Amino acid sequence: MENREVFVYIVISIFRSLQFLFWRFRPRYNDVTSALTRPLTSAASYDFKFMSYMVNKAKSVNKALEEAVPLREPELKIREAMRYTLLSDGKRVRPMLCLAACELVGGQESTAMSAACAIEMLHASSLILDDLPCMDNDSLRRGKPTNHIVFGESIAILASQALIALAVQKTTSSTFADVPPERILKTVQEMVKAVEGLVAGQQADLAGEGMRFDSDTGLEHLEFIHIHKTAALLEAAAVMGAIMGGGSDEEIERLRSYARCIGLMFQVVDDVLDVTKSSEELGKTAGKDLIAGKLTYPRLMGVEKSKEYAERLNIEAREHLLGFDIDKVAPLVSLADYIVNRQN
């Protein structure tokens, strides 16, 4: 045969082989497509209502947080400051993720509630520190004056440190008849790792202010910041929940990878909202990263490319959920969609 005929023959053969493979694995393909590529609006296909799930989990977490930080003397002022940030209106994404991960691997909500509260305490602590004048210098958080504006910098710092201590205490002081001590130890190790990540990410964030980066080094710098800063607590939330629920090492690592993806995605979306929404819409000061000269995803790649990157991270996050029970994984699939589509 002539070269052209040989080429056509090879192309047709490859096409037929791919067609055979597609039809052979079509049932699995359909499972993956139905589980991982639906938008949030089609979550009803799971017979699963994500917003109701999220609200119910938030109510359970809020009740536990309220009980964990009672007002008492002599540290009344510190506890008022702790409660001010900890109990302020929030979506409770991190504790919800912790509880969902626990349930995904076969555990019960009650088993992971202490860990869920602990992760929210760490989150509240990080918000107080982030807003300080020596850090991000912000005066608005969740639609209210930031902690140091209300209580002063010294009380805010003490409240932040007290929340970290309380997070550890919350995880270790509770006794679980059905949870081996080594699981408790592992959750504490994950918490410590998350705090280390927050510190490293914040330091890199501050160091990068006003610096110029090309596209490659800029993306590398951003990924380092937000894997350690934004993604750290989401990663810890998922892993701690999976550990408490008795997940296997493989399940834990897959959930870690999933959470890292949605953590980065959360930050990409946050950066986009910072330049496209008002302070009233966000409940915090809009455009402050631009004013501070911080490196952000829109600054590095533009708003539209940033949105595309968030969508790619959403797909990647979903891929890490393959193999889990289709019904139990619905909250995490929907959470990824919720994060990529959020407006504040």
Swiss-Prot record:
Detail which positions bind isopentenyl diphosphate. Answer: 91, 94, 123, 142
Which keywords does this Swiss-Prot/TrEMBL entry list?
Answer: Carotenoid biosynthesis, Isoprene biosynthesis, Magnesium, Metal-binding, Mitochondrion, Transferase, Transit peptide
Binding site residues for Mg(2+) 2: 130, 136
Sites binding Mg(2+) 1 sit at 130, 136
Q: What is its main location?
A: mitochondrion
Q: Where is the transit peptide?
A: 1-40
* InterPro entries, sorted: Isoprenoid_synthase_dom_sf, Polyprenyl_synt, Polyprenyl_synt_CS, Prenyl_diphosphate_synthase
Q: Which residues bind dimethylallyl diphosphate?
A: 141, 229-230, 267, 284, 294
- Give cofactor(s), names only: Mg(2+)
What pathway does the annotation place this protein in? Isoprenoid biosynthesis; farnesyl diphosphate biosynthesis; farnesyl diphosphate from geranyl diphosphate and isopentenyl diphosphate: step 1/1; Isoprenoid biosynthesis; geranyl diphosphate biosynthesis; geranyl diphosphate from dimethylallyl diphosphate and isopentenyl diphosphate: step 1/1; Isoprenoid biosynthesis; geranylgeranyl diphosphate biosynthesis; geranylgeranyl diphosphate from farnesyl diphosphate and isopentenyl diphosphate: step 1/1
Q: Which SUPFAM superfamilies match?
A: Terpenoid synthases
Which domain of life does this protein belong to? Eukaryota
Example GO molecular function: metal ion binding
Share what the entry says about its subunit structure, partners included: Monomer.
Q: Which PANTHER family match?
A: FARNESYL DIPHOSPHATE SYNTHASE, GERANYLGERANYL PYROPHOSPHATE SYNTHASE 10, MITOCHONDRIAL
Give the record's family classification. Belongs to the FPP/GGPP synthase family.
Q: What is this protein called?
A: Geranylgeranyl pyrophosphate synthase 10, mitochondrial
Q: Which organism is it from?
A: Arabidopsis thaliana (Mouse-ear cress)
